Curated annotation (Swiss-Prot):
Gene name, Swiss-Prot/TrEMBL: grpE
Chain's role: Participates actively in the response to hyperosmotic and heat shock by preventing the aggregation of stress-denatured proteins, in association with DnaK and GrpE. It is the nucleotide exchange factor for DnaK and may function as a thermosensor. Unfolded proteins bind initially to DnaJ; upon interaction with the DnaJ-bound protein, DnaK hydrolyzes its bound ATP, resulting in the formation of a stable complex. GrpE releases ADP from DnaK; ATP binding to DnaK triggers the release of the substrate protein, thus completing the reaction cycle.
Organism per entry: Staphylococcus epidermidis (strain ATCC 35984 / DSM 28319 / BCRC 17069 / CCUG 31568 / BM 3577 / RP62A)
Gene Ontology terms for molecular function: adenyl-nucleotide exchange factor activity; protein homodimerization activity; protein-folding chaperone binding; unfolded protein binding
Stretches that traverse the bilayer: none
This protein's UniProt keywords: Chaperone, Cytoplasm, Stress response
Family from the record: Belongs to the GrpE family.
Pfam families attached to this UniProt entry: GrpE (PF01025)
Ranges of compositional bias, category Acidic residues: 11-23, 47-60
Protein's recorded name: Protein GrpE
Ranges annotated as biased composition (Basic and acidic residues): 61-71
Amino acid sequence: MSEKDQSVNNTEEDFNVETEDNQNDTNIENSVSNTDNSEANASDSENNSEESIKDEESESQDTKIKELEKLANDNEEKYLRLYAEFENYKRRIQKENQINATYKAQGVLTDILPSIDNIERALQIEGDDESFKSLQKGVQMVHESLLRALKDNGLEEILAEGKEFDPNLHQAVVQDDNPDFKSGEVTQELQKGYKLKDRVLRPSMVKVNQ
């Protein structure tokens, strides 16, 4: 082989080696690029994963906040309802206590009324004997003293004669035909009626003009 041919062969070999080196460099660069891309993709995936976790945590927190707000509102409504019921209960008890205090003497006063009737019938009896008059005067004093004590405890007589008949206060037992009274007026009281403040203990028994 001539020197020229040998030189050509050497040149071709050098070219091939250089080509291979260039190819290797390209492959290395591509490999590095692919590695960089993989790392970038991995980084993006990691970022997306972190954002997804953050979104889930945020949604979970929002849900818990809403649940706590609902629980707080429910508890507030229950408290307000219980408070209102308790206030109504207190007012009812206070009213009942006031009523009981006002009408606590009702039973005793009702039991005493027949005795008052008997005393008043005794006072209507007439007599000329001095001892009788003295006794009657004593009964009169007892009667007046008893009425004062009863009135101090809220007992009131129901006015009847000359008044318009009121079924809430009067009990009509006889019809009358008296020109001195208007129709529907009480012409005579047959038995006194009494009330304790605004509560009727016993209605008046009366005659009513027709």
